[in-house]
């Protein structure tokens, strides 16, 4: 009886607990801002004397429309911040759940992998060692990596090092798949060399309790040790020497030399081109008994994957690479849980898998758990976030962010939670399985692996020799395999948007799966953020383009909320992101009102002597104070707040605006969206985040079209405030009713302050100066605006 009672108590221990975060004061502040916005709208709509004062024209109506849009966006933000919560995880209780895992349970993923979660699990990779997004596939978590072309492939090869903590059972279900979309022999060579280095690196980490498993970070600083640590010092010196040798070998590697002298191991790369090559699948490390590291082994399989590419087939960028990796991992190890991380990220917390498992398995309706997302964090980042790309304040939701995410494979396969319950008994004959047979098409091995995932019973699945499944893996990674199937539509990562990660997460939510956010201390994964103006704005343009594509497509969240299982508040949360491009257009219209009124001697804001001026001033002060305190609460500095505030204006008038017009032109058939890779320039040695720039915190420019609208806006405001000041000083506006007041001048000055990097860029030199081609095109836009303004 006592034993039964103890067993029940052990099983009832919580794996996670949801702790609501009380934000009463914040809610009140939200309503204050909303009230002021509505008051401004009411005042503008009921201003009977507007025509008499000369302010009832187009500027007044445009201002009303823009301010109504701002109120709508504020409502979306209020929804996203309405009921925040954190999840406290208890990984120490996983052992108790493991003991119960041998009995039948409702969970579809508990029986196949929890043995693996008894010990710490760290998935570490050196950014230069793998070429892309990293996929882990184990009987618990799977890890998958989809590789970057060229620059982010070979350069990422040295720093992605596979790790390890010990695994007691089912070692063969732990695997790492690295995708190289560039099909580079140098990337493959780097992975092979990194795996060899891991034979000494992993035991060193175990012996000395090293928590930072990424060697480029660990060796960036000298360790602290005492007189009794002679053995550790010797080991550290030896490992540092071995790592330096590894770095030199990889950096000195040449593709031509490898192909000429590498022998049969590189034969498949001989005629391969980046955009035209056959599928290449190579097992770099097979975790069988003879390859085990140490007495208990635990080092994962390491598989290199370069999916087939052909000029006649659309390869769907990252989504296509992730789908190929999903199929390859399914026919080789078929883990029920998968972790994917980008090529520039490494694991920073060895306990991250345990915490993620607590969230995947810890809910009462755990069968509905779809994914756990770890918010992105960055290493070696510039002080005070000068380019506003860390998203520490706005990115706190439950969206799938494309990296650092633990997925249940069943959710990726496009089925709904209810279908698993229905098909639990006799899964091979259940409707859900028959449907999946149609979706997965020709590969019997892939359909058989899917049967185990859908049934939720992994105990009967044999553990295969992965080397014997290479040909099958090549078959499912061929470019013709997806023809006639539902891959990219209902199965796998979704196609149809440049932000395939957000679209995939939305589809998972619309099917009825739940998600959770995982935040650990230290941060679970660290990556590098783009630096400089071109990289930052290119990234935001790509995001906004993809998000706007979703908004105007059949994947609109409003439709999914009506016809599928997407909750209404989830729908509003997705809309918060999808309207980025529309915000760019609306905010530009509002920003153009200021120079327009200064140039045409009009007014669209209240005069200081009017009662409505208090509403406008209160709204400006309240909103900025709210935003400022929000940054302070996140532990950021005043400078970080200002940098993000000014970058919001710059991004809106450049990246978001171009995304808006890009998608519109694509919609009417005049253009096609082009996937642009974000360049992330980082140090190749010490990982301290510094590059070759004299001042990496300064804004840099190039001839990209993304700089044209902001440059034009900067020039226009300089011209407008100059003309407006001239008129005010020399009294040319005395007899003009409704002329610009202090509000227009202050708004113009505030906007120029936000655009200060572009003001400096107009007179800067080198990469710190705006190219003459951009200045010329911007000048033409300014001239056109002045011409149109004078005609009115």
Swiss-Prot record:
Residues 140-151 have a biased composition (Gly residues). It is found in: Golgi apparatus membrane. InterPro entries: Cellulose_synth, Nucleotide-diphossugar_trans. The active site is at residues 181, 501. Keywords: Cell wall biogenesis/degradation, Glycosyltransferase, Golgi apparatus, Membrane, Transferase, Transmembrane, Transmembrane helix. It comes from the Eukaryota. One of its GO terms (biological process) is cell wall organization. Its EC number is 2.4.1.-. Pfam families: Cellulose_synt. One of its GO terms (molecular function) is cellulose synthase activity. GO terms for cellular component: Golgi membrane; plasma membrane. Its main location: Golgi. Residues 132-154 are annotated as: Disordered. The chain crosses the membrane at residues 25-45, 55-75, 579-599, 613-632, 650-670, 706-726, 739-759, 768-788. It is a multi-pass membrane protein. PANTHER family: X-BOX TRANSCRIPTION FACTOR-RELATED. Thought to be a Golgi-localized beta-glycan synthase that polymerize the backbones of noncellulosic polysaccharides (hemicelluloses) of plant cell wall. Belongs to the glycosyltransferase 2 family. Plant cellulose synthase-like H subfamily. This is Putative cellulose synthase-like protein H3. It comes from Oryza sativa subsp. japonica (Rice).
């Amino acid at each position: 009886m006592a034993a039964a009672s103890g067993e029940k108590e052990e099983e009832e221990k919580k794996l996670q607990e949801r702790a609501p975060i009380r934000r009463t004061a914040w809610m009140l502040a939200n309503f204050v801002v909303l009230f002021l916005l509505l008051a401004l709208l009411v005042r503008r709509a009921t201003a009977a004397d507007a025509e008499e004062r000369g302010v009832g024209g187009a500027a007044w109506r445009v201002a009303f429309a823009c301010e109504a849009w701002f109120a709508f966006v504020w409502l979306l933000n209020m929804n996203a911040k309405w009921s925040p919560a954190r999840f406290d995880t208890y990984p120490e209780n996983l052992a108790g759940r493991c003991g119960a895992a041998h009995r039948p349970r409702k969970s579809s993923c508990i029986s196949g992998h929890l043995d693996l979660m008894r010990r710490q699990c760290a998935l570490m990779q050196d950014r230069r060692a793998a070429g892309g997004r990293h996929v882990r596939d184990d009987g618990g978590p799977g890890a998958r990596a989809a590789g970057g072309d060229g620059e982010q492939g070979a350069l990422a090869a040295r720093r992605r090092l596979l790790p390890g903590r010990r695994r007691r059972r089912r070692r063969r279900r732990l695997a790492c798949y690295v995708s190289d979309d560039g099909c580079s022999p140098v990337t493959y060579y780097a992975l092979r060399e990194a795996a060899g280095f891991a034979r000494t690196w992993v035991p060193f980490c175990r012996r000395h309790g090293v928590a930072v498993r990424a060697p480029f970070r660990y060796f960036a600083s000298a360790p602290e040790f005492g007189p009794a640590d002679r053995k550790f010092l010797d080991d550290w010196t030896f490992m540092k020497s071995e790592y330096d040798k590894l770095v030199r070998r990889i950096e000195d590697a040449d593709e031509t030399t490898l192909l000429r002298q590498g022998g049969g191991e590189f034969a498949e790369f001989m005629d391969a081109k980046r955009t035209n090559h056959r599928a290449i699948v190579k097992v770099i490390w097979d975790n069988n008994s003879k390859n085990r590291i140490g007495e208990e082994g635990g080092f994962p399989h390491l598989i290199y994957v370069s999916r087939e590419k052909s000029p006649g087939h659309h390869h769907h960028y990252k989504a296509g690479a992730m789908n190929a990796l999903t199929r390859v991992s399914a026919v080789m190890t078929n883990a029920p849980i998968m972790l994917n991380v980008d090529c520039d990220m490494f694991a920073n917390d060895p306990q991250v898998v345990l915490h993620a498992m607590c969230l995947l398995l810890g809910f009462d309706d755990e069968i509905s758990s779809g994914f756990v997302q770890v918010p992105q964090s960055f290493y070696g980042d510039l002080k005070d976030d000068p380019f506003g790309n860390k998203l520490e304040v706005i990115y706190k939701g439950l969206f799938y962010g494309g990296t650092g995410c633990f997925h249940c494979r069943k959710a990726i396969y496009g089925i709904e939670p209810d279908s698993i319950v229905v098909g639990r008994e006799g899964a091979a004959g259940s409707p859900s399985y028959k449907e999946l047979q149609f979706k997965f098409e020709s590969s019997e091995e892939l359909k058989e692996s899917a049967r185990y995932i859908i049934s939720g019973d992994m105990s009967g699945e044999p553990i295969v020799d992965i080397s014997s499944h290479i040909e099958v893996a090549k078959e499912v990674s061929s470019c013709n395999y997806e023809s006639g199937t539902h891959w990219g539509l209902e199965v796998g990562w979704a196609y149809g948007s440049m932000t395939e990660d957000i679209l995939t997460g939305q589809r998972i939510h619309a099917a009825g799966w739940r998600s959770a956010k995982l935040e650990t201390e230290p941060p679970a994964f660290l990556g590098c953020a783009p630096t400089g103006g071109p990289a930052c704005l290119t990234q935001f343009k790509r995001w906004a383009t993809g998000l706007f594509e979703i908004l105007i497509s059949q994947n609109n969240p409003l439709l999914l909320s009506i016809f599928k299982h997407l909750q209404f508040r989830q729908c509003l949360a997705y809309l918060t992101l999808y309207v980025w491009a529309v915000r760019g257009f609306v905010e530009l219209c509002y920003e153009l009102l200021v120079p327009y009124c200064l140039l045409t001697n009009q007014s669209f804001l209240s005069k200081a002597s009017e009662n409505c001026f208090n509403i406008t001033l209160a709204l400006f002060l309240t909103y900025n104070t709210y935003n400022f305190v929000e940054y302070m609460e996140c532990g950021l500095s005043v400078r970080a707040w200002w940098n993000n505030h000014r970058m919001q204006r710059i991004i809106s008038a450049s990246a978001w605006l171009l995304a808006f017009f890009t998608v519109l032109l694509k919609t009417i058939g005049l253009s096609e969206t082009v996937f642009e890779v974000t360049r992330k320039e980082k140090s190749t040695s010490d990982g301290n985040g510094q590059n070759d720039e004299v001042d990496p915190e300064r804004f840099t420019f190039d001839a990209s079209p993304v700089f044209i609208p902001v440059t034009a806006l900067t020039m226009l405001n300089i011209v407008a405030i100059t003309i407006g000041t001239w008129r005010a000083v020399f009294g040319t506006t005395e007899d003009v009713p409704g002329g610009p007041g202090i509000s227009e001048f202050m708004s113009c000055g505030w906007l120029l302050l936000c655009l200060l990097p572009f003001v400096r860029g107009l007179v800067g030199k080198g990469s710190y100066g705006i190219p003459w081609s951009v200045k010329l095109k911007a000048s033409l836009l300014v001239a056109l605006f002045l011409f149109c303004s004078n005609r009115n």
